Amino acid sequence: MARIEKGIDITGGRSELSSFLIVLGFVFIGFFVGQFVGAIASIVFALINGAPTDVLTEDPTVLYDYLGLGEVLTTQATYTLFFCFITPYVYLRAIARKNIDVLSNERGVQFPLVFATIVGTFCFLFLNAYFIEWNANIHFPEFMSGFEDWARDLEDQLAETTEKFTTFNNFTQFLFGFVVIAVLPGIGEEFLFRGVLQNSLHRWTKNAHVAIWVSAFIFGAIHLQFYGLVPRMMLGAVFGYLYLWSGNIWYPIISHIANNGFAVIAVYYAQVEETAPNLDDTEAFPIGLQIGGSLIFIAFMFLFRNHYLKQKQSSE
C-alpha cells in the first residue's frame, strides 16, 4: 500500500507535537542559514570582482551589479543546498534517525504516471493563472497602506533579482539556470516541505488536509513574496496531494521540477525568439484553452487519486 494514511513516522520517538515544533525550528533556522551563506557567497564574489567595500556597506542593493550570471546562480544554488537539502537531511539523520528513503512508501516511479504528472502540471498553469492575477491585484485598506507599500517594494526588488539570474546569453547558461532554478528546488523543497514538514504535521494533527494546506502556506510564505503567496500555496497543495495519494515523494518532485522548468524554458524562448507567452497573464490564453487546460488538470488529479485508491483496495 503506497498511500500515506497517518503520516510517515519521523518523530524519532518524540511526541508528535514536539517533533513538529523541532521540524518548524529546522525550517526557519535552515532558511536563515541558507540566506546567510548565500549572502556571504555573493559578497565574496562581488569583492573578487572589484566591488568597493564602502559601496556595499552604504548600499547593499548594488551587490548584484558586480556579479555575473554564473555567480548569481551559484549563490542561489548555495542557498538551496543549505536550506532545502542539508536541513531535511540533518533532521532525518540526527533527530528522526532514519535514512531519507523513509519518505517514500513506494520504490521507483511508473512512466505513464510520470508523463501524466508533467502534462497535469502544465495544465495547472492555466488554472493557477487566475490565482496569480487575483493575488497580484490585491489592495489593502488605507490603514494597511504601509504594509502594502512594503510588500510592493519587496516584490519589485525580488523581480529585479529574478531577472538577474534568468537572463541567459547562451544554451549552457540556460542549462545551468534550469538546474539551479528548476531541478535543485524541485528536489530539495519537496524533501523539506512535503517529506519532512507535511509528514510531521500529518502525524500531529491526524488530518491529511490540514497538513497539506498548512505546509503549502508555509511553502508559499517562505518565498517572501506576498503577491505570489496564493499561487505558490496552490502549487504546494497540488504537490501535497500527489504525495499523500501516491506515498511516493518523486511525483511531487517531478511536478515541481516541471512547473519551474516550464517557466525557465519560457524565459529562454523569449530571449531567443524575442516573444513568448506570459504564463502569469490569463488574457494571454483564449478562454477555451483556459477552460480546457483547467479541466484536463482536474481530470488528471481525479485519475491519479483513483489509481492509488484502486491499488489500495486491491491490496486489502
Task: Kindly label every feature range from the protein language model.
Residues 7, 257-316:
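C-terminal membrane module of polytopic membrane proteins
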Residues 53-57, 101-184:
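Juxtamembrane helix-loop-helix connectors linking adjacent transmembrane helices
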Residues 40-94, 111-122, 143-147:
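Alpha-helical transmembrane segments in multi-pass membrane proteins
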Residues 188-214, 244-247:
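Membrane-interface helix/loop boundary segments of multi-pass membrane proteins
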Residues 9-32, 104-123, 246:
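Alpha-helical transmembrane segments and their helix-start/interface "positive-inside/aromatic belt" motifs
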Residues 217-281:
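Functionally important transmembrane alpha-helices
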Residues 64-83, 155-184, 284-296:
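Hydrophobic alpha-helical transmembrane segments
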Residues 27-31, 84-89, 118-124, 288-308:
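Hydrophobic core of alpha-helical transmembrane segments in multi-pass integral membrane proteins
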